[in-house]
Amino acid sequence: MDESALLDLLECPVCLERLDASAKVLPCQHTFCKRCLLGIVGSRNELRCPECRTLVGSGVEQLPSNILLVRLLDGIKQRPWKPGPVGGSGTNGTSALRAQSSAVVTCSPKDGPSSQGGPQPRAQAWSPPVRGIPQLPCAKALYNYEGKEPGDLKFSKGDIIVLRRQVDENWYHGEVGGVHGFFPTNFVQIIKPLPQPPPQCKALYDFEVKDKEADKDCLPFAKDDVLTVIRRVDENWAEGMLADKIGIFPISYVEFNSAAKQLIEWDQPPGPGVAAGEGALATTPSSTTTKQPDGKKNTKKRHSFTSLSMASKASQAAQQRHSMEISPPVLISSSNPAAAARIGELAGLSCSAPSQVHISTTGLIVTPPPSSPVTTGPSFTFPAEAPYPAALATLNPPLPPPPLQAATPTGTAVAAAAGMGPRPTAGPTDQTTHPRPQPRPSVYVAIYPYTPRKEDELELRKGEMFLVFERCQDGWFKGTSMHTSKIGVFPGNYVAPVTRAVTSASQGKVPMLTTGPASRGGVLANPPSTGGPAQKPPGNGVAGGPGVPTAVVSAAHVQTSPQAKVLLHASGQMTVNQARSAARTVSAHSQERPTAAVTPIQVQSTPGQSHHPLVSPQPPAPLGPPAHAAASGLGRVGGPLACATAPASIPAASLEPEPSSRPATLLPGTPTSPDSGSAARPDKDGKKEKKGLLKLLSGASTKRKPRGSPPASPTLDAELGAELSCGPPGPPCACPGPCDGDTMAPGPQRRASSLDSAPVAPPPRQPCSSLGPAASEVRPAVCERHRVVVSYPPQSEAELELKEGDIVFVHKKREDGWFKGTLQRNGKTGLFPGSFVENI
C-alpha cells in the first residue's frame, strides 16, 4: 500500500480531512481532528463523541493523542516510498508529486522523475502549477496523444498531467504546461485521483424540534438546506452536520447525493432492513484504484456523458458531478422505538410539505407510511393494442399500511387473513412490525383531475397512470407520470392503486361480466364451472355465518390497500359513485365481509368461515337511484347491517360501513325467486333511466372542482353534487330494490323485519328521485347530538364552521367519515368531518 492510499484511510470521520499528529483520541477510542472537537465544544458547550454520543468530561486540550496514528505518520515520512516507474527513491509522497508536477515547467517530461526528486518537501513550492497545494490530482501519460479535434490536449509519453475534472468515464479535462484540453482516460495512468464530492443531502422539508431539551441530539434544518452526512444511525435516522452543529435527522426528510448514498449504504444496519439508496453505487476505476490501460482504442465520444455510476441517470453530465445528484428518498420503519415515536409525534415535528395532519375516521392522527424502497426498475408502458387487464398482470400491488390501533378485537385474525390473493400470506407479526419491501414502484391511476398549485406538483388527469416512488407522511405521493415522464408530488387521495385482477374459485372472488345484458344491468353471476348447489348460498344468496366484525377504515391510506381491488374499465371512464367507491376502498387491515351482489372486490374471510360468490339467475334489473349512503344502514353494537345495492351502471362499488370500529352483523334476507319481481319494467325503460342517471352523475362530477390546499378528498364534492342532483338535502337515499344479497329483482320489496328490532334505529332512507321503480317506506329522521371537540374551518360553502364546544345534530353519517348535520348555534346545515365531533 503506497502513501496516498494509506493517507486516504487516515481521515477525520467528521470533516473528512486527513488526520495529523494533533488529532485527539476520546475515551471511547474514537479519533477526531482537533479542529472538529473544538467546533463541537463551541457550538454545544459540551463534548460528545460524534460516533457513539459518549459524553467526554475533560477538555479538548487534555485529551491524549493517538499514538498509533503518530507512529504511522512518522513511518510514512521516514520510510522510502517505491511506487514503481513514477517515483524516485529517497523521497516521500508529497515531494515526489511536487517534483513530478513541476517537471512540466522546469525540465523535460522524461527526466523529470529522476532529476526533481529531493528530500525536502518544500523545495518545489515555487512551481506555478502546484503552488500552495501539497497534492494535486494528476496522471502520467502512458502513450503519446496528438489530439483528434480542436480542444484536445496533446502530450507525450511520460508527461505528468494535472487533472481538472472528469467529463465522463472515458474522458478527462486536464492541463500540461499551462495548456488545457481533453484527453482519453485509457492514455494515462491515474496517480492521484480527483477528490470525490462530499457526502451531502438536501432537505426536502423543514425539520424542527419544539422540545429542545428532550431532542437536543436532533439537528433541525429548513427546507433546501444542504447538510453534510456523517453516518447512518439506524434504519430511519442519519447523523449529519449543518454549519457547526452536529446531530441526527430523519432520512425521509432529505435527498442524498451519490457520495452520501454510498455512505448510507455502507452504514446500513444488519438485517432485512431496506437500504436508503438505490443499491451500492459502483464508482469509476479512476476514483478508487489506479486505472490500467485496456489496450484498445477508445470508441466512445467524449461528450456522450455516460454515467459515472451504475445507478446515475444517463442525462447527467460530468461537469455537474459536484452538484446534488438526487434520487427519491426512502421512508423506512425505524427499528428504534424512540426514533419512530419522535417521527410520529404530531407536536414534535413541523413539515413544510402540504398537510402534515390528515383526517381519518378515528380522529386527527399521523400514521407512518409503509416502506417504499426506491429501485431503478424498468419503466412500465402499456401498449395500445394490449388489453388493460393483461398489461396490469405484471405489476405488483402496493404494500399494506400498518394496522391502526383502533382496530376491532379481531384485528389479529384480520391481519392474518390480509395476505390472501396472489401474494403470500402475511402473519400478524408482519402486519404489526415492518412490511416486506415491494420489489418495484407501485402503479397508480388518477381517479380525479388535479391542477398543480406549486412548482413541484404534478397535474393529474383522470385515467392517467403514475409510478409512485414514495408515500409521504402527510398523505402526498411522489412519483412520475407514465405519460409525460415528469416527476413531482401529488395528493394521494386523488389516485387509486392499479392491481392485478387475478380470479380464482378457491379465493372466493366475485367475477364481473363486462359484456352482454347482465353487465348492462350490473348483475353479477358465477361462471358455469363454479356453479352448483355447493357454492350457492341458501336463502337470499349471501354467505351465512355470524356477524363479521369490521375494522376502522383510514381515509388517508385507502390508496395503499392491497385487498380492496377495484377492477377498472379499459376505457378509463368512471361514474361518480364508482370513483367514490374506488377512492374509499377498505384498507388492508379491514375485514372483508359478504356484501350485496354488486361488488367485484376480492372477498376473503377468516379461517373457517364459509365464503361463496353470489348467484343471480334473473335478468338485469332496472336502474335504481344512487346508493351513496350504503353504509348508513349500519347499526350500532349488535345491530344488523343493511346493504344498499349500487346502481347498475357501477361495475366496481364498495359497500362500506360507517366509520366505526364496532361490529356489525348481516341481516338474514328473505329468499327470493324469479317470480318476486312482478312489477318489473321493460329493459328499454331501464336503458333510458340508466342514461339519465349517467348524465346527472357526470354533470355533478364535472361541475365541482377540488378544494384548496391541503386538498381534501374530492369524493366529498362529487357526492355533494350527486345529492343536490337527486333532490333536496335530507335523509340518505335508499335502494328501492332488495338488499342484503338478494338478487336484483325489480318491484317494490321491503327489507327484512329484523331491521326494526335493532337496539338503535339506523338512519332513515328515502328515494332520491323518481328514477327508481318503487319507493321504499320513509322513516322519521333520527338526529344524534354531537359535541365539537376540535374547531374546524370550512373549506367550501357546503361545509359547516365548527367551534370547540358547539352542539351539532347529525342527520347522516357517510361512509367516507363525513357527517351531515345542523349546527345548533346558527341553525345552518352542512357537512363536516366526523372526527372533529363526539357523540353525547
From Swiss-Prot:
Pathway: Protein modification; protein ubiquitination. It catalyses: S-ubiquitinyl-[E2 ubiquitin-conjugating enzyme]-L-cysteine + [acceptor protein]-L-lysine = [E2 ubiquitin-conjugating enzyme]-L-cysteine + N(6)-ubiquitinyl-[acceptor protein]-L-lysine. A zinc finger (RING-type) spans 12-53. SMART domains: RING, SH3. Residues 616-625 have a biased composition (Pro residues). Residues 134-193, 196-259, 439-500, 781-840 form the SH3 domain. PROSITE patterns: SH3, ZF_RING_1, ZF_RING_2. It is an enzyme of class 2 (transferase). One of its GO terms (cellular component) is cytosol. Disulfide bonds: none annotated. GO terms for biological process: negative regulation of apoptotic process; neuron migration; positive regulation of JNK cascade; positive regulation of proteasomal ubiquitin-dependent protein catabolic process; protein autoubiquitination; protein ubiquitination; regulation of CD4-positive, alpha-beta T cell differentiation; regulation of CD8-positive, alpha-beta T cell proliferation. The modification Phosphoserine is found at residues 304, 709. Residues 273-282, 307-320, 405-424 have a biased composition (Low complexity). Residues 681-692 have a biased composition (Basic and acidic residues). It holds the Pfam family SH3_1. Gene3D superfamilies: SH3 Domains, Zinc/RING finger domain, C3HC4 (zinc finger). Residues 434-537 are annotated as: Interaction with AKT2. Residues 292-362 are annotated as: Interaction with RAC1. One of its GO terms (molecular function) is ubiquitin protein ligase activity. Keywords: Cell projection, Cytoplasm, Golgi apparatus, Metal-binding, Phosphoprotein, Repeat, SH3 domain, Transferase, Ubl conjugation, Ubl conjugation pathway, Zinc, Zinc-finger. It comes from the Eukaryota. Its main location: cytoplasm. The RING finger domain is required for ubiquitin ligase activity and autoubiquitination. Has E3 ubiquitin-protein ligase activity. In the absence of an external substrate, it can catalyze self-ubiquitination. Stimulates ubiquitination of potassium channel KCNJ1, enhancing it's dynamin-dependent and clathrin-independent endocytosis. Acts as a scaffold protein that coordinates with MAPK8IP1/JIP1 in organizing different components of the JNK pathway, including RAC1 or RAC2, MAP3K11/MLK3 or MAP3K7/TAK1, MAP2K7/MKK7, MAPK8/JNK1 and/or MAPK9/JNK2 into a functional multiprotein complex to ensure the effective activation of the JNK signaling pathway. Belongs to the SH3RF family. This is E3 ubiquitin-protein ligase SH3RF1. It comes from Bos taurus (Bovine). The gene is SH3RF1.
